[in-house]
């Protein structure tokens, strides 16, 4: 069964490349933190390195928000390691500042509902998991289009805001923007401000 927002995220234990070495990584080790789990189809391709590099360059922004970034593919840990040893200018990913998970048996991709069975690769899924291990947001792209780091950060900040303050975030919300008190009467305050 595919994962569902508001339900516990599927647990996992996978071998990952972390700072150039192999380590076992589990979802449970990040309990108490936000987790952004992203899937890519294949190493040594075209859109995939652009995404990994973009998220790696923004990893400090995620860390400042108490969020751990993880990437996964159906490639082996050896493929991931080889890819980190190729310079970015040559299509590699170089040093990556988050764990990259090897899903060689496809269980992780299947559990998260992104596996294209006949091809043995994952769709471009992003899963935002809260500190309790509950799925809060799912986005799945078809293979040819990469994801936006800015949108991932915006969604993380919006969910964190709603958790902290109990208000809800309207379309295109960014930190500092007006929010909505979730009741028919109180919400009028927001709508009166933005719809003059």
Swiss-Prot record:
Extent of Basic and acidic residues compositional bias: 175-196
Gene behind this protein: TSA1
Up-regulation conditions: Induced by oxidative stress.
Known role: Thiol-specific peroxidase that catalyzes the reduction of hydrogen peroxide and organic hydroperoxides to water and alcohols, respectively. Plays a role in cell protection against oxidative stress by detoxifying peroxides and as sensor of hydrogen peroxide-mediated signaling events. Also involved in the correct composition of the hyphal cell wall.
EC number: 1.11.1.24
Binding partners and assembly: Homodimer; disulfide-linked, upon oxidation.
GO CC, one annotated term: cytosol
Residues at the active site: 48
Signal peptide: none
Organism of derivation: Candida albicans (strain SC5314 / ATCC MYA-2876) (Yeast)
UniProt record similarity statement: Belongs to the peroxiredoxin family. AhpC/Prx1 subfamily.
Main location: other
Record-annotated Thioredoxin domain positions: 3-161
Any single biological process term in GO: response to oxidative stress
One Pfam family cited in the UniProt record for this chain: 1-cysPrx_C
Gene Ontology molecular function, alphabetical: high molecular weight kininogen binding; thioredoxin peroxidase activity
Phenotype upon gene inactivation: Results in delayed hyphal development and enhanced sensitivity to cell wall-perturbing agents, yet does not impair virulence in vivo.
Protein name: Peroxiredoxin TSA1-A
Keywords assigned: Antioxidant, Cytoplasm, Disulfide bond, Nucleus, Oxidoreductase, Peroxidase, Redox-active center
UniProt-annotated location(s): Cell surface; Nucleus; Cytoplasm
Binding positions (substrate): 45-47, 124
Region feature (Disordered): 173-196
Principal EC category: oxidoreductase
């Amino acid at each position: 069964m595919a994962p569902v927002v508001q339900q516990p995220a599927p647990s996992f234990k996978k071998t990952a490349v972390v700072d150039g070495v192999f380590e076992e990584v589990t979802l449970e080790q990040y309990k108490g933190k936000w987790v952004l789990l992203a899937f890519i189809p294949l190493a040594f391709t075209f859109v995939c390195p652009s995404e990994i590099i973009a998220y790696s360059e923004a990893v400090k922004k995620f860390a400042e928000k108490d969020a751990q970034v993880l990437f996964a593919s159906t490639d082996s840990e050896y493929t991931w390691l080889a890819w980190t040893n190729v310079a970015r200018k040559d299509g590699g990913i170089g040093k990556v500042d988050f764990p990259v998970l090897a899903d060689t048996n496809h269980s992780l991709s299947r559990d998260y509902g992104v596996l294209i069975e006949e091809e043995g690769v994952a769709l471009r899924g992003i899963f935002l998991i809260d500190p309790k291990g509950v799925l809060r947001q799912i986005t799945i792209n078809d293979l040819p289009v990469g994801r936006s780091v800015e949108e991932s950060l915006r969604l993380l900040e919006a969910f964190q805001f709603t958790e902290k303050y109990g208000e809800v975030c309207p379309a295109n919300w960014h930190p500092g923007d007006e929010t909505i008190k979730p009741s028919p009467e109180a919400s009028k305050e927001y709508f009166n401000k933005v719809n003059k």
